[in-house]
Regions:
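Hydrophobic, Leu/Ile/Phe/Ala-enriched alpha-helical segments that form helix-helix packing faces
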Residues: 24-39, 84, 88, 127, ...
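Long, charged, glycine-rich C-terminal linkers/tails
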Residues: 38-55
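Switch/communication elements of ASCE P-loop NTPase nucleotide-binding domains
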Residues: 51-163
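Coupling/switch segment of ABC-type P-loop NTPase heads
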Residues: 1-35
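Intrinsically disordered, low-complexity segments enriched in polar/charged residues with Gly/Pro
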Residues: 29-31, 40-41, 114, 141-143
Length: 163
């Protein structure tokens, strides 16, 4: 959140035109739109409450939410995706608006933690749609996560006797 606040201040003072910052904002907006099935999502930093404001349209109504007031599962998913986008943007600034197409591998342990049933069934699709050139390696105990992927993308590890 500190990074988001600093970058917002730089933008307001016209001391920066950080393309990494813009990529992270767009990624959060896209993620929130997919998660909540809403449109016209805009994210901004609110200095009064030191939180992100998320404005969106739902059933033709304009809604303003703060990140701290949304479902914990959504918060976790948005945080995870924003973190990946931030790291991609910081490591590959030369890619500018194409940074989400950075190839790589991301390892996530126990991806189902903090996610409700719907998110467990959709998190891998959201990740692969958002970052199409990333290979995600995840561990899970959730049958919902396992059931959400094609069998050719699944490796089951079993403990062997004596090991």
């Amino acid at each position: 959140m500190d990074w988001f606040k600093r970058e917002t201040l730089k933008q307001l003072q016209k001391k920066s035109n950080n393309s990494s910052f813009k990529v992270v904002i767009k990624t959060i907006e896209k993620c929130f739109s997919i998660l909540t099935k809403t449109k016209n999502v805009t994210v901004s930093y609110n200095f009064d409450n030191s939180d992100l404001d998320i404005q969106h349209k739902y059933r033709s109504k304009n809604i303003l939410s703060s990140l701290n007031r949304i479902n914990d599962g959504y918060k976790y998913a948005i945080g995870l995706i924003a973190n990946i986008a931030y790291r991609m943007a910081e490591l590959n600034p030369q890619l500018r608006n194409k940074v989400l197409y950075t190839p790589g591998i991301v390892i996530i342990d126990a991806i189902e933690l903090h996610l409700d049933v719907d998110l467990q069934m959709n998190i891998l699709k959201i990740l692969t749609d958002t970052f199409p050139n990333i290979q995600f390696i995840t561990s899970t105990f959730s049958p919902l996560v396992i059931g959400s992927i094609e069998s050719e993308n699944l490796i089951i590890l079993r403990k062997q006797e004596g090991n």
